[in-house]
Amino acid sequence: MTSARILATVLSAGSLILAAPAIAHADDWGSAQVVAGRERVKVTVTGTQYPVGHCRIDPSIGTPDTQSIAMHPSGTIVINNLKPGTHRVAVWCPQGGVISETDVQVQPGNLLLDLQDQAYAAAGSSDKVTDPALR
């Protein structure tokens, strides 16, 4: 393999990694996946192995906009009305479970694309939805 091919392979693999959602692991405690969208993030928690009643999500930890939002210990939640920019999203489950902090880039809102996404979702064409946090 030539140097140019090796470089092209490495660069293309890097671009795939950048396009992937952020996944935070806590070994056998479970995992949290955070996907940023337009003024929202989607958080999915899976694999919690201990009996926990709920998990907590903070989509803006370390800022004046910090919150603590409850969610089921295995499931998905979409948190709306976030300011565009970098957010550190914290996920933790009391009594054991996922503990993670993930940096994501929240995009600015776009009313026309949001309306289009709602129409696609209502028509059963969720594969055409443009906001990753709504897929």
Describe every region a protein language model picked out.
Residues 28-64, 69-70, 78-86, 92-98, ...:
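Composition-driven, intrinsically disordered low-complexity tracts enriched in small residues
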Residues 1-26:
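Secretory targeting and sorting signals
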